[in-house]
């Protein structure tokens, strides 16, 4: 992939190659997870093992004209996550309940039957594993920076089951010092606009 242009359009053939590479990666990971599960079964450990698989971000495959991972759009912020516990939930449950990656640790504590330290900010989502309609939080928060007018701005993005609202503020993202006003806001309704085309 060393021939990707730093600026400008990516050719149709290169786009196909990038999408193929992404799908090959997903297929490879699926195969590796299958091997892990088979080995746990072979060793007699599958009924005593909690499995968590997650990514720290999604990935743009040309949507919004982007081929990157870092944005506040749904495709980048929506991280893949699988949790399996032999004692909790039904197989193949899917939920659209808003959760955050900081919910993983308290969930593991809950599933393992140990107390979650009081200073932990996340919330256990073990009840979502049993009932996919259960909610542990109203919305999930994400943030990411970008350049605007030669200055770095921070985007704070709040996502519930229906909407995403992102507010862009001029600030020094390292110190947290705000040095400007809100420069833009975005609001997307996923029921009528699942691809974030209408702001």
Where are these regions (language model features)?
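Active-site-proximal cap/lid insertion segments
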Residues: 1-98, 111-119, 174-185, 196
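C-terminal cap/loop subdomain of S1 sulfatases and analogous C-terminal strand-loop tails that border
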Residues: 57-63, 89, 102-105, 110-190, ...
